Amino acid sequence: VNDFKLKDLDQYLSLWRQIYASPEGPRWDHILPYYSENIFFKDSVQEIRGIEEFTAMTARLSRRSKNLELAVHSSCMQGDLIFVEWEMIISYKKYPKSSIYGTSRIRLEDGKIADQRDYFDLWGDIFDNIGFFAKGYRRFMKRKFG
């Protein structure tokens, strides 16, 4: 019997918040059993298939990102879909903390996370926090795409 099945939104949010609660940095070991062996994950940086590749990605993220914080702003679950609106706060050596705002869409199959798509504006959110770069970047984006 596999006890690692998500039953409701509160259970998922509790597991997700624990990732970023450790003083040593992000830890994924407690939530990985809730992911499907055939997990499909995609974000602005990468596309991953399978639990081995996903586990390797979480290990890389944990090694690189010791100073991560996460705030959940809103969430909902309808059927087998979970949506989470979040803010990830990253600390850099030379620059002030940066916030990346995003949304995750999680699809469950038999209580396991089968599909996760994270949507965020990686470059815009980071560049907004680099003083000498932010104004020029935003001016360029507005002129070309606004």
Summary of predicted features, one role per range:
Residues 16, 35, 58, 86-88:
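Hydrophobic alpha-helical core bundles mediating ligand binding, dimerization, or RNAP-core interactions
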Residues 63-69, 76-146:
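A beta-strand edge to alpha-helix "cap/lid" segment located at domain peripheries
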